[in-house]
């Protein structure tokens, strides 16, 4: 079998259409009105939320991509964890999922079985049910899930409702995109790959469960648009988010790779999108790249009231030891993001 990495031009969330291009396309779509639709695509949120009754709403999301690793079972786990993450980012719990499969006709079908087995493992871990799916032949393998979850409509974690005085908690380290780029170039150290794979395979379920014990004003997961673009979405039009680059958790080797200008195309698209929205000033170039790096199955970014942020951080660190306070929310300034 030709290797996954050699058969794919890109992989993971680095394959996403850039945020600038995507927003242009979506702006041409009609606005759908339904009083039961609590969250739609107009907010660029992580999932759709549709109210069923006073106490129940359905969370719906879909995510798929090409492989970023050679091991098909690990790829399946990562893709499933990434798809499930959107439900956790909304404050919900996954109920069931459908497989989405694109697979080359000439490739070994046993490897597809391994991909699906890896995805099923993560669904079982999440307590969700696999109900079926859809498959087609394609030139490159692709896998993901359409996931349905539930939540209380009074407890939705939206991505753009932070409040001045909040502190920001990031639950996973940055840098997996850069490490995967190094892996493709056969330059990655084993420890870096191990750290990246462990992070991408880990469900955001555990951080979300800890966070539910605290008032969460806003939440999103960090994926292909990188920390800065997702933070820009969180700031919305009424607040500014101040980030502390020196406090960021990241995979150590990713900093070194960025220092050597081992970059990703998606990261540079993210940089272009952020032009005029942030001033890097004297922020070291490697930290800039880590904030722009496309994450696959990245961590949650939680906006928590300042008076309980430290307590929330300690609780989340029981599940995610590398979680860190990385910023704060202030009233709107000239730019949506400031670096301090």
UniProtKB/Swiss-Prot annotation:
It is an enzyme of class 2 (transferase). ATP binds at residues 16, 43-45, 63, 86, 133-135. The active site is at residue 13. Mg(2+) binds at residues 46, 86, 221. It catalyses: hydrogenselenide + ATP + H2O = selenophosphate + AMP + phosphate + 2 H(+). It comes from the Bacteria. GO terms for cellular component: cytoplasm. Its cofactor is Mg(2+). GO terms for biological process: selenocysteine biosynthetic process. Keywords: ATP-binding, Kinase, Magnesium, Metal-binding, Nucleotide-binding, Selenium, Transferase. Its EC number is 2.7.9.3. The record marks 16 as: Important for catalytic activity. Belongs to the selenophosphate synthase 1 family. Class I subfamily. Synthesizes selenophosphate from selenide and ATP. This is Selenide, water dikinase. The lineage of its organism: Bacteria, Bacillati, Bacillota, Clostridia, Eubacteriales.
């Amino acid at each position: 079998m030709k290797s996954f990495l050699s058969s794919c031009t890109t992989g993971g969330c680095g394959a996403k259409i850039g945020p600038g291009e995507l927003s242009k396309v979506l702006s041409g779509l009609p606005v759908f009105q339904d009083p039961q639709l609590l969250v739609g695509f107009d907010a660029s949120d992580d999932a759709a939320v549709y109210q069923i009754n006073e106490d129940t709403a359905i969370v719906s999301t879909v995510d798929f991509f090409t492989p970023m690793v050679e091991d098909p079972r690990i790829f399946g786990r990562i893709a499933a964890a990434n798809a499930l993450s959107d439900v956790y980012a909304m404050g919900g719990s996954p109920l069931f999922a459908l497989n989405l499969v694109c697979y080359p006709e000439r490739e070994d079908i046993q490897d597809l079985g391994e991909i699906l087995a890896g995805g099923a493992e993560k669904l079982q871990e999440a307590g969700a049910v696999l109900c079926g799916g859809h498959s087609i032949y394609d030139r490159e393998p692709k896998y993901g899930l359409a996931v349905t979850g539930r939540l209380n409509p009074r407890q939705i974690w939206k991505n753009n409702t932070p409040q001045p005085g909040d502190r920001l908690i990031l639950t996973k380290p940055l840098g997996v995109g850069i490490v995967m780029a190094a892996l493709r170039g056969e330059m990655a150290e084993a420890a870096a790959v191990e750290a990246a794979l462990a992070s991408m395979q880990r469900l955001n379920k555990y951080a979300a469960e800890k966070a539910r014990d605290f008032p969460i004003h806003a939440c999103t997961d960090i994926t292909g648009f990188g920390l800065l673009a997702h933070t820009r979405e969180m700031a919305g039009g009424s607040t500014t988010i101040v980030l502390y680059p020196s406090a960021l958790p990241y995979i150590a080797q990713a900093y070194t790779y960025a220092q050597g200008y081992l970059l990703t195309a998606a990261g540079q698209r993210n940089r272009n999108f952020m032009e005029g929205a942030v001033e890097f000033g004297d922020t070291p170039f490697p930290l800039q790249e880590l904030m722009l790096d496309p994450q696959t199955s990245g961590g949650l970014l939680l906006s928590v009231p300042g008076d309980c942020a430290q307590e929330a951080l300690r609780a989340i660190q029981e599940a995610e030891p590398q979680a860190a306070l990385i910023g704060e929310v202030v009233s709107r300034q000239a730019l949506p993001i400031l670096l301090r």
